[in-house]
Amino acid sequence: PESVVNVPILAMSSIEAQANLGYSMNFKEFTLCQTMYITANVCVVSPVIYINVLDPKKHKKDLEAQTVKVDEYQATVGMEGILKKGLVVTAGETELKENEDYTLAFDTDGYLVVTLITSGKGASASELTVSGKMLDTSAVDKYDIIGAYDVNSGKETGMEVIRQIFPKLGMVPGILLAPGWSHEPEVGIALCAKAANINGVFRAVAFLDLDTEKAKKYTDVKEVKEKSGFTSELCYVLWPCFMVGELIFSASAVAAARLAYLDAENEDIPSKSPSNKQTPITGTCLADGTEIVLDQDQGTVVNSFGVATAINRNGFRPWGSYTGAWPASGDAKDVWLNVRRMFIWQGNTFIQTYFDKVDDNMNRALIDNIIDSENIRCAAYAPQHWAGASIEYLASDNPATSILAGEMKFRQHIAPYTPAQTINNVLNYDIDTLTSALTEG
């Protein structure tokens, strides 16, 4: 429906998302449905906020006349994306009227079902002819996903709608993704830019896919990643696609759901890496279905490029904790996904926790209140989620000019754990124990 185009749609379940936006198993054309399926059948998580850019006013084409058989007053048009608005239904030469002669609905496959009303003109018809308009997913392009701001209407589209999430829904986005589109450099880079600045104060991470038409083997990954421009500390880059049986998904859709599930198990604190956590997928492949079989050694090579993948070790699992900033950066707070997310989470949490203090009198009581409250709050997360954290108010950070301007600055120190990416075990031959055992007695 037009009412759910370019607006943030909050869904507390996959069923709720499907009810608002519709659903199709054609994940290549209806890309949001990937997340609907995964969050219902692979990693059950909620809430999810969807932004649909498929606009029936703009992305449509003619529906050529379809003749369908009537069975027990019902006729099903076996095509997805048919628009109810402007639909013409005829029985022979007689044009029928909706809600007088028939009703319309969609079945679970997304096909249009025409149900004849027994008192209507077409009640005795054995077949119907249907024509009108239908959605044209091929008309959607990367610039629809990126979106824009219309200076005349004041309307936002695409990624620009991310701005509306907090003021409308009161939620701060944590992971941004565009499955089926983020492999496009323009889309991926724009998504990272949005993650860096949400409502002027918040930050998030972006999960991006590499183009499997360009990166067909694991040794192609480095060049494709760099040419795509996916080098931000705010992005988590994945290659190739993930499979569940015969279904093919963008890796970003699966990994984002798996990480959200991990967060939920971890008190909603993003202190853990998704790497090496078993995930119910059955394989990896290119977008065209070509199977990719990586062992640990090859997966680690992919990781060395700052790209995550999946390997099979008694079950498939994501493999890789680096953000896109690796290997160009060696800064621990930027190259480890869980460390970067902890910095983002702490920054966002501080803003939300102390927002009510804004415009209070800037006095010592306010300073002490924030310092004491924050130190107590942060201490509760040690040692499980980080090694520790502290906050201070320094005179050097708060000169008279800042105080007179109504500005105050705190300096916080946090110590999230880095992942144990490599665990080495050095074996030594204990000759003393050997000789002792042989000479005893």
What are these regions (language model features)?
Residues 120-136:
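Small/polar beta-strand repeat architecture
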Residues 43-107, 134-137:
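Extended beta-strand solenoid/passenger and fiber regions
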Residues 103-125:
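A surface-exposed beta-strand-loop module
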Residues 1, 9-12, 22, 31-59, ...:
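A glycine- and small-residue-enriched flexible loop/hinge signal that marks low-structured segments
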Residues 48, 58-63, 131-139, 143-151, ...:
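Compositionally biased, low-complexity/repeat regions
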Residues 6, 84-88, 125-127:
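Exposed beta-strand and adjacent loop surfaces of beta-rich binding modules
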Residues 336-396:
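Acidic, low-complexity glycine/serine/threonine-rich segments
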Residues 1-9, 15, 439-441:
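N-terminal alpha-helical "arm" segments
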